[in-house]
Amino acid sequence: MLASALLLALATFGSAAPIALETRQTCYSGVYVIGARGSDEDAGFGSTASVVTSIIAAIPGSGSIALDYPASVLDPLYPESVTDGINALISLIESYADACSGEIVLVGFSQGANVITDALAGGVDKPTPINPSYIEHVSAITVFGDPSFTHGQSFDAGTDTSKDGIFAREEGGASLALLNTYASKLKSYCDTGDVYCASGTDTSAHSEEIPTWGSSAVQFIVSLST
């Protein structure tokens, strides 16, 4: 009788559906850096890698993650890729903030910059921006070459002071107003002539923004996060 019961139990166990294991969020005593790469850069941190690495080195006990999104222009099309990035970023921020007490840092380049600022403030035909209560967990945000750059904002940085990006936010609009509520923890770097953030013709200006301003961005982040 006992042997039969044991065999039945084993058979039932073997045929049961596998149990999904809960994925636990890793928390850091330093900061949790989320890096969002630019268009058509290989999966991972892309051009933001140097900034992310410097932050990790400067703030002990920190960790990082590369935003998992298409970062594409044509397949899928740019707007869909940005939307995918927004949803992924909001999910990462909410998951970390719900599970951990540490601070979050956001770093984005080009399309990745667009993803970050749209996640914060919304955009045309984009998902609802993240609940501002979650941004209380974000200590610093630095973006480079953001196509939605709008000149004349207090958080603007770089050499461009007169031109807007190719997807600039509307002056006086709700999106730009919401983005300005995060001005104390945000820097948006854009240089004169940049094809995307300054509607210029200098492709090298776009690619040189992180090499030019990366150290300044790290100093800004460290000043707000330690």
Language model region names:
Residues 24-102, 187-211, 223:
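Active-site catalytic motif of lipid deacylating hydrolases and related acyltransferases
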Residues 138-149:
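Active-site nucleophile loop of the alpha/beta-hydrolase fold
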Residues 45-46, 118-119, 152-156:
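Short, solvent-exposed loop/turn and secondary-structure capping segments
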Residues 26-28, 98-99, 115, 132-136, ...:
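Extracellular/periplasmic catalytic domains that process cell-envelope and extracellular macromolecules
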Residues 106-116:
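Gly/Ala-rich beta-loop-alpha elbow adjacent to hydrolase catalytic centers
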Residues 153-226:
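C-terminal catalytic-base region of ester-bond hydrolases, centering on the histidine
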Residues 1-25, 226:
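Fungal secretory targeting signals
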Residues 122-134:
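Conserved hydrolase catalytic core segment
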